[in-house]
Regions:
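Short, charged, surface-exposed secondary-structure boundary motifs
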Residues: 141-151
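Conserved SAM-binding loop
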Residues: 116
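Conserved "right-hand" nucleotidyltransferase catalytic core of DNA-directed polymerases
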Residues: 245-247, 251-290
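Conserved active-site carboxylates
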Residues: 160
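Accessory alpha-helical DNA-binding modules that contact the DNA backbone or grooves
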Residues: 154-157, 165-239, 261-262, 268-275, ...
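Noncatalytic, basic helical substrate-engagement surface that gates or grips nucleic-acid strands
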Residues: 1-113, 123-141, 231, 236-251
């Protein structure tokens, strides 16, 4: 079976360890049926997504074979991480985004410096004094100030800006004619730390001329719905789900099964990962979290 996704995950983990040297690592997976709540709000949410290509050099798999291989690789990746001092979380009926948002603000990590590793723009709304986003594709760290500098929008108002613009990757159309530049230029108050709401944007449209502003005023319901789906400031998690996450964080045993990993790598045909620095780091991490 092709193993491009497993290798990619391991290489990103290795790179993060070298760059950040974190005290703890938490990997969050989408829970089974994770999109259910958002699909109840909008049944088209995430419809029509192209499957992620995990094996860049393999072109002879059918769509069904790609899907089977993806599930197999995800299971294998989880097995690898199970041998490491890495916390893995997967909450039924909850998307990974909501769990990550909860982790950023939960008492367990209060006062910690946190780095979210993702290419997803959804996480930019969570940048604050203690939280950075690292984007692997661009190989860059994004801080709160960088968000304001790059988009002209404060993280506090990022979900509102994205609700106006829409998100093609999640199949959520926004107001036609609006992009980050248009939003930042016409609604400059969104660069402030103060939280603004759709009504503030609609009020500002009254003084402006142009079809795009008419479309915005007429399309308020769509923007409100987009906001519900995109905002991560208050994650859609029950008290029980939060308690389950808290329990896992508190009771996790940091262990490292180096020999088992080497056996698995031989079985799966891994040849190019240098484990020496990761072994040193993981051994240190196990001691640190005893």
């Amino acid at each position: 079976d092709p193993i491009g996704g497993i290798k990619g995950s391991m290489k990103i983990l290795q790179k993060m360890i070298r760059m950040i040297q974190p005290s703890q690592i938490v990997i969050v997976w989408d829970g089974p049926n994770g999109s259910r709540k958002r699909k109840q709000i909008n049944s088209n949410y995430k419809e029509g997504r192209a499957p992620i290509r995990l094996n860049r050099n393999v072109n002879n798999l059918t769509d069904d074979e790609q899907m089977i291989n993806k599930v197999w690789q995800q299971g294998k990746t989880i097995e690898y991480f199970n041998q490491m001092p890495v916390i893995q979380l997967c909450v039924p009926e909850i998307e990974a985004d909501d769990v990550i948002s909860y982790l950023i603000n939960c008492s367990h990590y209060e006062g910690w410096q946190k780095v979210i590793v993702s290419n997803d723009k959804d996480f930019l709304q969570l940048c604050d004094d203690f939280t950075l986003v690292y984007r692997p594709v661009k190989d860059e760290f994004v801080s709160r100030n960088k968000v304001i500098e790059e988009y002209g929008i404060h993280p506090t108002n990022m979900a509102l800006a994205r609700a106006l613009i829409g998100d093609n990757s999640d199949n959520l159309p926004g107001i036609r004619g609006l992009g980050f530049k248009t939003v930042a230029k016409n609604f400059p108050f969104l660069a402030e730390e103060k939280t603004y709401y759709l009504q503030h944007v609609v009020d500002a449209c009254e003084e402006k001329k142009g079809k795009v502003f008419e479309r915005l005023v007429e399309g308020q319901d769509r923007v409100k719905e987009n906001y519900k789906l995109m905002q991560l400031y208050s994650p859609t998690m029950s008290i029980q789900s939060k308690q389950k996450v808290d329990w896992n964080l508190t009771n996790f045993k940091h262990e490292f099964s180096y020999i088992d990993i080497l056996k698995m790598m031989r079985q799966d045909g891994f040849g190019e990962l240098n484990w020496s620095d990761m072994k040193i780091y993981f051994d240190k991490m196990v001691k640190l979290n005893k």
